[in-house]
Amino acid sequence: MDPDRQADIAALDCTLTTVERVLDVEGLRSRIEKLEHEASDPHLWDDQTRAQRVTSELSHTQGELRRVEELRRRLDDLPVLYELAAEEAGAAAADAVAEADAELKSLRADIEATEVRTLLSGEYDEREALVTIRSGAGGVDAADWAEMLMRMYIRWAEQHKYPVEVFDTSYAEEAGIKSATFAVHAPFAYGTLSVEQGTHRLVRISPFDNQSRRQTSFAEVEVLPVVETTDHIDIPEGDVRVDVYRSSGPGGQSVNTTDSAVRLTHIPSGIVVTCQNEKSQLQNKIAAMRVLQAKLLERKRLEERAELDALKADGGSSWGNQMRSYVLHPYQMVKDLRTEYEVGNPAAVLDGDLDGFLEAGIRWRNRRNDD
């Protein structure tokens, strides 16, 4: 094996060893053993919320351990591939070296992707995520764009086998949604998806324009950590106004004959939260309270860091505040304006192929925090 390839393998070994240490491989095995014990409890599904959390974390942790173990196996096998290639002659030798080089390139990409997980060390990074999408400038196209984004994130979660719980969907009159709030129930979902926060811009030929003109639309994505019982977010009963109404579907159609939908208004802050996707008023109230607690936790966190005013100044779904651009016409390109990461296949991205953008965003955030 030539010195350059030896150096590449040694560098990958160093990176993977660091990843194994940070992820605590033995700790992962112990955690899996504990979760498997919980999952075997015959009464686990008596509490569906707990059951969902346990099974989701177990699946995630098992996948994480399998990923690291597989990377180590592949890295250990790589020198053997080059040794076997050296025993070949002529065209067979060239083919064997090319095969080993392809594995080296693939392994480097996979180790670097796994390394990104070690960068999720923020205070709330290991939490589940609460995602809110709001349509911005662009009329019916913006409402349709907001719904496309919602589908994109749900497809991403489904591809990773992460459960999604939709709390509220406010439909627009003609098409699309005004807003939606949903939770992604997976460890580190917040740390991963928080880089998606900001304004997303779509450029396309409008399907709602009789003259088929090009339209620019905006939608805003907000990502919060799901509140846990240890967060101590106390909300006095008198600080919250509760309004009930009938759930509505696309076009404003009523989908429920009872007043099961709930709107909570936090009077001191003016924060308004709605929930209409559960079957009963009580379930909707509980779900809405979870969302309100998450928003108040984020508000408290930002105030403690003296960032609230700066973030408000940066807010709004408009041209000047976009973080990613999705162009479907006159060319096809999705480009993150912070990281410069781009993909020429918008259809794949909108179908949930987001990992490249998420990894680039996490690395970008980590570099920013180090500066």
Curated annotation (Swiss-Prot):
Keywords assigned: Cytoplasm, Methylation, Protein biosynthesis
Superkingdom of source: Bacteria
Chief localisation class: cytoplasm
Residue(s) carrying N5-methylglutamine: 253
Compartments where found: Cytoplasm
GO cellular component terms listed in the entry, alphabetical order: cytoplasm; peptidoglycan-based cell wall
SMART domains listed in its UniProt record: PCRF
GO terms of molecular function: translation release factor activity, codon specific
Description of post-translational modifications: Methylated by PrmC. Methylation increases the termination efficiency of RF2.
Miscellaneous remark of the record: Was identified as a high-confidence drug target.
Primary role: Peptide chain release factor 2 directs the termination of translation in response to the peptide chain termination codons UGA and UAA.
Stated family: Belongs to the prokaryotic/mitochondrial release factor family.
Protein's name according to its UniProt entry: Peptide chain release factor 2
Source organism of this protein record: Mycobacterium tuberculosis (strain ATCC 25618 / H37Rv)
